[in-house]
C-alpha cells in the first residue's frame, strides 16, 4: 500500500492567530466561518457580522448547495462551487481554514472541509477547537466585513469521495463498503425523533453501524487524538483498512467520520450526500430499520 502524504486536516488556534498577526491572510490563506444553526435558534450570519476571526469570510452553506434538490444539503455543481468560493478570494492555490461557532467546538466546518476536498482541493484544514476555543483563549475578533479580491477556482469533482443513493442501494447486495452512520444513537435506532424534520421518521439504513460524531470530540471541543479515534472505530468493529461510506441525516455530520478517518491516515472515506433524508423517501421499506412505533421507518 502506497502511503500518500496527507495535508494537515487540522490547524491550531495558536497557528491561525500567529498567521493573522504576521499578515498571512490573503490570496494564499483564506479563513471561512461556516456556521449554521437550526431555524429559530441562533443566527449564523448575524453572529458573524457581530464578531468573527479577523479576515474571515462567511461561507453560507444555504447558498452553496443544490437548491433545486428536494433533499436538504446536496452538493452544488462544480461551476456553482467554483464561482462561490472564487468570490470569497479562494483560488486552487489557497490554503483554506474553516471553522464554525457551534458549542460543540465543531459541527459544520468538517462538511465544508469535505466539500473542498470532493471538488479537488487538497489544501484545506479545520480550525481545531473552533470559534468556541478561539474566544476562550482570548484571540482577536472583529466585526469588520471581509472583502477579499475575487479569484478563479476551478472545481473538479472527485467522485470517489461521493456516494449516491443508487450506489448505496447496490452496496446492500455487494457489501463492498462498510456503512457508518454518525447520528446520535436514539435517532439511529428510531427511538428519538429527527430534530426540525417534517415527514422524516428516524431510523437507519439496514446494515449500517452507528458511530455518533460527538464521540470524536473532547468535552472542550477539540478533535481527539488519532489513537483515541482509532480506538473508537475499532470498538465499533469498523476496519479502517477497508472501504467505508459515511452517512447521517443530510450529509453534514457524516463528514466528521471522513475527518476522523483522515486523521487516522485514511483519506478515502466517501460520503453519502443524500443520507437518511433521501434514503427514507426513496428506499424500499425493508431497507429502513427503526425501533420506533411502526418497527420500520
Swiss-Prot record:
Q: From the Swiss-Prot or TrEMBL record, state where the protein is found.
A: Mitochondrion matrix
Subunit comment: Monomer.
Chain positions found as N6-acetyllysine: 14, 136, 163, 175, 224, 236-237
Q: Which CDD domains match?
A: TST_Repeat_2, TST_Repeats
Q: Which GO terms describe its molecular function?
A: 3-mercaptopyruvate sulfurtransferase activity; 5S rRNA binding; sulfurtransferase activity; thiosulfate-cyanide sulfurtransferase activity
Positions where Phosphoserine occurs in the chain: 38
Every Rhodanese domain range: 25-143, 173-288
Which superkingdom heads the taxonomic lineage of this protein's source? Eukaryota
Record: glycosylation sites: 35
Q: Which gene encodes it?
A: Tst
Q: What is this protein called?
A: Thiosulfate sulfurtransferase
Source organism of the structure: Rattus norvegicus
